[in-house]
C-alpha cells in the first residue's frame, strides 16, 4: 500500500480510512474498463445488482436527509450513477450481440430474469413496459425535477443577499460569533452551488432516458442483423431472442434510473426542516382527523354505487374512519397546559420599611404575556441568552460592560408588546410574535408577502410579520428574515448603542478604573485622583461614548489626560485632545482598510464665517443655522447613495460646536476634525456644505 501511495504521489502515512480519496478515480477507471473490455456474464450480474443496490441507497439517503446540504454530493453521485448505467448498457450490448444466439442466459441471470420473469417472456409486453417506464422517467419525474432545480437555483441565487444580510444582522447584534457567521456564510454559498449543480445534473438524467430508448432500438436492429446474417437464425427466432435480451437489459437499467430520478425529485422538492421527508409527509397528511372523515365519506359513497367493487371501497372507508378516531383520541389525550395557581391573599398588613423603596433599574424590559416563553429557559426561550451575548459583544467593542437588563412581565401591555426602559423611562417599544418571522425589506426586495405589515423597530425599515411556511419564499424574494427573539435583541442592542453615554455612570467609571488598575497600577495610581478627579474622567469618557467613540484604549486615554490635565481641567477641552490621541482608532472605526476616505467638507468662506462666529461668542445666526442644517441633510443623502460613512470633516476648532448643533437633528452624523484623521489617508470630498 505504501508503494502504491509513492507511485501515485500520495502521502505515505495515509490511514486506512483515508484511502477513500481514491474511490472516485477507481470508479472512473472501472467505468471506462466496462466500456472497453468484454465482461463475463457473472461479472455483469454483479454490476447490475450493484447498480440496483446503489440506486436504492441513494433514494433512502435522499428520503432521510433533513437539509439539502446533508447530501451535497448528490449532483456528483448523479453523474457517476448515470455513467455507470451507460457503461453497463455498453457492456451488456456487447455480450448480447456476441453471445445472444446461444440462449436467454447469454447476458447473465439478471438480464434473463428481467426479460422473462418480469414480462412473462413476451417481448411485446416487454417493449410496452419499457416504453412506459421511459416515459414516466423522462416526461414526468425528470422534467419536473429539472424545472424545480432550475427555478430553485435562480431563487436561491436571488435570495443570497437577503440571507447574507440576516447573518450580518445577527453578527452585529451579538447573537452569533465570527466563527458561526463564517459557517453560515459558507452554508449559503454551498446551497447556491448545490442548486446550481442540480440544475445541470438534471440534464444527465434526461439524457440517460433518451439514451435508453436509442440503445434499445440499436440493440434490436443490431441483434436482428447479427442473428440472421452471422448466425443463420430465422427472422422470428432472432427477433424473439435478441428482443427479449434487449428488453431485459433495458429494464434492468431503467428501473435504477427511475429510482435515481425519484431521489433527485425528492432532493429538489423537499423543504428544509428538522424532519426527514417521511416524517413531514406523515405528520402533514395525517394530522387532521377531519380530512380522514371526509375522505372516508367520499369512499363510502363510491362503495355504495352499484357495479363498483364495494368490498374494497368499504374496507378503505372503515380504515380511514378508524384512523380518524385514533388521531382524534390522541389529540384529546394530549396534556393540557397547567393553569396558573392562584396564590392565597394575605390580609396581614406589614409595616412599611426602607426595603419597600424600589430603585429604578438602569436598564429594563417589560413584556406582554405572549412573550413570556421567549424569556423562560424552561420553555426554550432564547432571548436571555441573546441578551447576554449582546452585553458581551458591546463590552468588547465599546470598552465597558453595560448594566444588566432586568426583565419582568407587565399584564397592562398588549399580549405581544414589549418595551425597553432606561432608569424607568421608556426609550423604545415594539411588537413580537413568537413562532412567526419578521421579513425586513432592505429596499431591494421583490414582490409582496401575505402577513401583518409593520416597521422594523431598530432601523425603521418596512417589514412584514409572516408565517414560518413563507420564510424561504421571503428569502428568495430578497427579504432579510429574522425570528421574533432576534427582532427584540437587535432592537435592544441598537438602543444600548444609542444611549451608551447615559448608561455609563460613575459606578461604571469606577469599575472600569478598577479593571484598568489591574493591568496598569502605576498609571492609575498617579493619575486618579491626584491629577484627574473621577468626576472629570467620567465626563471625558461619557463625551467619547456620546459620539460613538469606543473607550477600549484606556492606556492612550489615561496617558493623554496625564499629559494635559495639569494645564487644562475643562472636560470638553480634555475630550478634544483625547480624540486627537485616538485618531488612528477613530479613522479605523469609520474607514476600515481604506486608503481613500470619502467625507463631507465645509466650503472655505463658510468655515471662515463659522470661525468668526465662534471667536465672537455670539453663536450662529438663525438663517445661517437653517441653511447649514438643510445643506448637511442633502450631503448626508448623497453620502448614503454612494455607500460612504456619514462623516463630516471640519476644522479642529469648529468640531465641538458643529457636533453639538448638527447631531441634535441628525443623530447619525459623525463630525471629525482634521487632526483626528490619520495622516496616511487620502481625503476625497464627496460633498461640500456652503457656497449657496
Swiss-Prot record:
Keywords: Bacterial flagellum biogenesis, Bacterial flagellum protein export, Cell inner membrane, Cell membrane, Membrane, Protein transport, Transmembrane, Transmembrane helix, Transport
Segments crossing the lipid bilayer: 24-44, 46-66, 71-91, 95-115, 121-141, 209-229, 247-267, 296-316
Entry annotated with the keyword Transport: yes
Entry keyword Kinase: no
Localization of this protein: Cell inner membrane
Biological process according to GO: bacterial-type flagellum assembly; bacterial-type flagellum-dependent cell motility; chemotaxis; protein secretion by the type III secretion system
Membrane topology label: Multi-pass membrane protein
Predominant location category: membrane
GO CC terms in record: bacterial-type flagellum; bacterial-type flagellum secretion apparatus; plasma membrane; type III protein secretion system complex
Superkingdom of origin organism: Bacteria
PANTHER family: FLAGELLAR BIOSYNTHESIS PROTEIN FLHA-RELATED (PTHR30161:SF1), FLAGELLAR EXPORT PROTEIN, MEMBRANE FLHA SUBUNIT-RELATED (PTHR30161)
Protein function: Required for formation of the rod structure of the flagellar apparatus. Together with FliI and FliH, may constitute the export apparatus of flagellin.
Family affiliation: Belongs to the FHIPEP (flagella/HR/invasion proteins export pore) family.
Protein name stated in the entry: Flagellar biosynthesis protein FlhA
Amino acid at each position: 500500500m505504501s508503494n502504491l501511495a509513492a507511485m501515485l504521489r500520495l502521502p505515505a502515512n495515509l490511514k486506512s480510512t483515508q484511502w477513500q480519496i481514491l474511490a472516485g478515480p477507481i470508479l472512473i477507471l472501472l467505468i471506462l474498463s466496462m466500456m472497453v473490455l468484454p465482461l463475463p456474464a457473472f461479472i455483469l450480474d454483479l454490476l447490475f445488482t450493484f447498480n440496483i443496490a446503489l440506486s436504492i441507497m441513494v433514494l433512502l439517503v435522499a428520503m432521510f436527509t433533513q437539509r439539502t446540504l446533508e447530501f451535497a454530493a448528490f449532483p456528483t453521485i448523479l453523474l457517476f450513477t448515470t455513467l455507470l448505467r451507460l457503461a453497463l448498457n455498453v457492456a451488456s450490448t456487447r455480450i448480447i450481440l456476441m453471445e445472444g444466439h446461444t440462449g436467454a442466459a447469454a447476458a447473465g441471470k439478471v438480464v434473463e430474469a428481467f426479460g422473462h420473469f418480469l414480462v412473462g417472456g413476451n417481448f411485446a409486453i416487454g417493449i410496452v413496459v419499457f416504453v412506459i417506464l421511459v416515459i414516466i422517467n423522462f416526461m414526468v419525474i425528470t422534467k419536473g425535477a429539472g424545472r424545480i432545480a432550475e427555478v430553485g437555483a435562480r431563487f436561491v441565487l436571488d435570495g443570497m443577499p437577503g440571507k447574507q444580510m440576516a447573518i450580518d444582522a445577527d453578527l452585529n447584534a451579538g447573537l452569533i460569533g465570527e466563527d458561526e457567521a463564517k459557517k453560515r456564510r459558507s452554508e449559503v454559498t454551498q446551497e447556491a452551488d448545490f442548486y446550481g449543480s442540480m440544475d445541470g445534473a438534471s440534464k444527465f438524467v434526461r439524457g440517460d432516458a433518451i439514451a435508453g430508448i436509442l440503445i434499445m432500438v440499436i440493440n434490436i436492429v443490431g441483434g436482428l442483423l447479427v442473428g440472421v446474417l452471422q448466425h443463420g437464425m430465422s427472422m422470428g427466432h432472432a427477433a424473439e431472442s435478441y428482443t427479449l435480451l434487449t428488453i431485459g437489459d433495458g429494464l434492468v437499467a431503467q428501473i435504477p434510473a427511475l429510482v435515481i430520478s425519484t431521489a433527485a425529485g425528492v432532493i429538489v422538492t423537499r423543504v428544509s426542516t428538522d424532519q426527514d421527508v417521511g416524517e413531514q409527509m406523515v405528520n402533514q397528511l395525517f394530522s387532521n382527523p377531519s380530512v380522514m372523515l371526509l375522505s372516508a365519506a367520499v369512499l363510502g359513497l363510491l362503495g355504495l354505487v352499484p357495479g363498483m367493487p364495494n368490498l374494497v371501497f368499504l374496507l378503505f372507508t372503515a380504515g380511514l374512519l378508524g384512523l380518524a378516531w385514533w388521531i382524534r383520541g390522541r389529540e384529546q389525550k394530549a396534556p393540557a397546559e397547567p393553569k396558573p395557581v392562584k396564590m392565597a391573599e394575605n390580609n396581614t398588613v406589614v409595616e412599611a420599611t426602607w426595603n419597600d423603596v424600589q430603585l429604578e433599574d438602569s436598564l429594563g424590559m417589560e413584556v406582554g404575556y405572549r412573550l413570556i416563553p421567549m424569556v423562560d429557559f424552561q420553555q426554550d426561550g432564547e432571548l436571555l441568552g441573546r441578551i447576554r451575548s449582546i452585553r458581551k459583544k458591546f463590552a468588547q467593542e465599546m470598552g465597558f460592560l453595560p448594566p444588566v437588563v432586568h426583565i419582568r412581565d407587565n399584564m397592562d401591555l398588549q399580549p405581544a408588546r414589549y418595551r425597553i426602559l432606561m432608569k424607568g423611562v421608556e426609550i423604545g417599544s415594539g411588537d413580537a410574535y413568537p413562532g412567526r418571522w419578521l421579513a425586513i425589506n432592505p429596499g431591494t426586495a421583490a414582490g409582496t408577502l401575505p402577513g401583518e405589515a409593520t416597521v422594523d423597530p431598530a432601523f425603521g425599515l418596512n417589514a412584514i410579520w409572516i408565517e414560518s411556511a413563507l420564510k424561504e419564499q421571503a428569502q428568495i424574494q430578497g427579504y432579510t428574515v429574522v425570528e421574533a427573539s432576534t427582532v427584540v435583541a437587535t432592537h435592544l442592542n441598537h438602543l444600548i448603542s444609542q444611549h451608551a453615554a447615559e448608561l455609563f455612570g460613575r459606578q461604571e467609571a469606577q469599575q472600569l478604573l478598577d479593571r484598568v488598575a489591574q493591568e496598569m497600577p502605576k498609571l492609575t495610581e498617579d493619575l486618579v485622583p491626584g491629577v484627574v478627579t473621577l468626576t472629570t474622567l467620567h465626563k471625558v469618557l461619557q463625551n467619547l461614548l456620546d459620539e460613538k467613540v469606543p473607550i477600549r484604549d484606556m492606556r492612550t486615554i489615561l496617558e493623554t489626560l496625564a499629559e494635559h490635565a495639569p494645564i487644562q481641567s475643562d472636560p470638553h477641552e480634555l475630550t478634544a485632545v483625547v480624540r486627537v490621541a485616538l485618531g488612528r482608532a477613530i479613522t479605523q472605526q469609520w474607514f476600515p482598510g481604506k486608503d481613500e476616505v470619502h467625507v463631507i467638507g465645509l466650503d472655505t468662506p463658510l468655515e471662515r464665517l463659522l470661525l468668526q462666529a465662534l471667536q465672537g461668542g455670539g453663536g450662529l445666526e438663525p438663517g445661517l443655522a437653517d441653511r447649514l442644517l438643510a445643506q448637511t441633510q442633502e450631503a448626508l443623502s448623497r453620502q448614503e447613495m454612494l455607500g460612504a460613512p456619514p462623516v463630516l470633516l471640519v476644522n479642529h476648532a469648529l468640531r465641538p460646536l458643529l457636533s453639538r448643533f448638527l447631531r441634535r437633528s441628525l443623530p447619525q452624523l459623525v463630525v471629525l476634525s482634521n487632526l483626528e484623521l490619520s495622516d496616511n489617508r487620502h481625503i476625497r470630498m464627496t460633498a461640500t456644505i456652503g457656497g449657496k
